[in-house]
């Protein structure tokens, strides 16, 4: 009898060890892919920031894209730093740096979500009420909205850090409440508004395109593609705390979900530059143009003429 129990216990230990090895290998692969994605994202977003910040004349919509690229760059940098620190033992100094990178990462995440919500909402308003929006839109609205969103996200994430950082006055109950409030803001306000405005924009532009037999503008494609990629790739990170606290999942499943959410969110923050350049070069005869030309073409609002070109008049006055 004892021999039977010992053999069954040994088999269970071997099974658990084998399962743990598989989970460890899967996490290692996901972390490696996330690191590679972050490096590509840093290169792509740095290129967008350099082009929009120093090589191109800014338009109202390009200001949003510039700030979104900055938020994405901060996110992938913090993610890459965390992945790098996790490959070595976390001593006192590296542990503090890891905590700082984690807080900055969530800050960049909320900034990116807020900017995408503002972009999709303003594009929706400009399509639903074009004359009113053009006449009543403040000249520096884009810059003011971006600055306000950065400050609000800094405030909310600063409060979260005060209650949840293990190097400050950590309180588990208060941290849980603050996390739930922030999750409710992300999942209950920002994400639904972004989704609803994007769906409205898609239906309205699609109907107008069928009625007037015109192709949608490249800017419309850029906005919808960016929102779609965010919803598919970045929402798993937003749902992470819900999965951690409310779903009674096995520890191995939670670890795999956590690593998968880090990879998918890294892909989301790295995909936007690729979207801009793919849309900017789509149906164009001048594929050999500079990167700045391709990016400028992707951010234009004007409908395309024959050959994939756009009118040159009023380019810098039109914005989203």
Swiss-Prot record:
Stretches the record annotates as Disordered: 301-320
Cross-referenced Gene3D superfamilies: Rhodopsin 7-helix transmembrane proteins (1.20.1070.10)
Coiled coil regions in record: none
Membrane topology: Multi-pass membrane protein
First-listed, main subcellular location of the protein, grouped into a coarse class: membrane
Pfam families: 7tm_1 (PF00001)
SUPFAM superfamilies: Family A G protein-coupled receptor-like
Recorded family membership: Belongs to the G-protein coupled receptor 1 family. Mas subfamily.
Protein name: Mas-related G-protein coupled receptor member D
Protein source organism: Macaca fascicularis
Top-level taxonomy: Eukaryota, Metazoa, Chordata, Craniata, Vertebrata
């Amino acid at each position: 009898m004892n021999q039977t129990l010992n053999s069954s216990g040994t088999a269970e230990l071997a099974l658990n060890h084998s399962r743990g090895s598989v989970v460890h290998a899967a996490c290692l692969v996901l972390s490696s892919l996330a690191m590679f994605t972050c490096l590509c994202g840093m290169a792509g977003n740095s290129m967008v920031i350099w082009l929009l910040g120093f090589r191109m004349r800014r338009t109202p919509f390009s200001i949003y894209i510039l700030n979104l690229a900055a938020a994405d760059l901060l996110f992938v940098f913090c993610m890459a730093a965390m992945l790098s620190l996790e490959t070595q033992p976390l001593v006192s100094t590296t542990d503090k740096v890891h905590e700082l990178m984690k807080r900055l990462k969530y800050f960049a995440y909320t900034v990116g979500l807020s900017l995408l919500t503002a972009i999709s909402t303003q594009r929706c308003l400009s399509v639903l009420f074009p004359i009113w929006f053009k006449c009543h839109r403040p000249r520096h609205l884009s810059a003011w909205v971006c600055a306000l969103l950065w400050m609000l996200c800094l405030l909310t994430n600063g409060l979260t850090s005060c209650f949840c950082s293990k190097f400050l006055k950590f309180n588990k109950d208060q941290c849980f409440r603050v996390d739930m409030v922030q999750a409710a803001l992300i999942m209950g306000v920002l994400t639904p508004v972004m989704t609803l405005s994007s769906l409205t924009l898609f239906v309205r532009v699609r109907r107008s395109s069928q009625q007037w037999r015109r192709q949608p503008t490249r800017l419309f494609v850029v906005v919808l593609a960016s929102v779609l990629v965010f919803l598919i790739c970045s929402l798993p990170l937003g749902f992470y705390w819900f999965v951690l606290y409310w779903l009674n999942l096995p520890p191995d499943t939670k670890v795999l979900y956590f690593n998968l959410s880090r990879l998918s969110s890294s892909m989301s923050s790295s995909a936007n530059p690729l979207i801009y350049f793919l849309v900017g070069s789509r149906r164009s005869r001048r594929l050999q143009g500079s990167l700045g030309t391709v990016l400028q073409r992707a951010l234009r609002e004007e409908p395309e003429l024959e050959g994939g070109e756009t009118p040159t008049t009023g380019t810098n006055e039109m914005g989203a």
